[in-house]
Amino acid sequence: MTGYVTDALFGDPRTGHPVALFGTAAARLEHRLWADSKPRGAAYAALCTFGAVGLGAALQLATRRRPFARFLLTAAFTWVVLGGRGLAAEGTEMARLLEAGEVPEARQRLSHLCARDATALDSAELTRAATESIAENTSDAVVAPLFWGAVAGMPGLLGYRALNTLDAMVGYRSPRYRRFGWAAARADDVVNLVPSRIGAALTALCAGGRARESWRVWRRDGSRHPSPNAGQVEAAFAGALDIRLGGTNSYGGEVESRARLGEGRHPEPVDLRRAVRLSRLVGLAAVVIAAGAAPATPWGASPVQSIGSRWGQSPARRSVDNSAVAGLAVHNSAVAGLGVDNRR
């Protein structure tokens, strides 16, 4: 919970962001290892990802007898791998630019959300692109880190963010990365299979009076997207907001036609603001679930539980009702249960 709240209050670290440092190191390794080869790309993805997982596992083991240190590290890693505040800020700024009719500025701003070619996009297409990115990144930048943090603690947090970053760097279908980036892209698909569907279900849960429509559109249209994961949350958002997503997109000169998701109107800037609000609600629901799930997983168990357990076993505390300690542990279990963008 501490990491989630820190991200909500302050957003990404302004300097020396660990994800940016990882990206710099990964880019240097790519320069040394690149070849138009799937095996070479798989080796590159494995080195980068297992390096991050290994660091997380080493810190998890090193702090097994130091619950407060584990608490601080888990909170810090959760903060740096989450992107909820930054995502909401970018969506809100895009909505402001589009409402003001500042289309050239909105075209430039879209690159903060996705890799789509915005050169020829009008206001309607910019709105659709931003709304789709808000939906997809609600899963990628919020739900998935929380899920992997709850399941696998620090190794899960760092490993997931490493894979997601590699996918954003090399997971393209361009001539350079079609083969070299294949392994990173497929691995990212695998680790997002469960979180994306949790994100879609939470979207329907948070859709208020359109919960049934969100669920129906998700189940009907989620598999129509070329990505096994992005379409799940995008379809749920389309149903929740009563809008239509999908269409023709351009990436680096390659044109891609995607199936329509939903059956409502074309999204407008006001719908982009609604998508941001829905994204925040989904994030809150996800952190509540992560808080409840973390104590049940060996690597995701809350360090506060360990603190409470040791305190309760001390002679000075034997007379204290242990249920208070247990309640404190449950309330704070999100500490370890918590845990921007890809080929759009």
Predicted stretch roles:
Residues M1-R344:
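Short amphipathic, positively biased membrane-proximal segments
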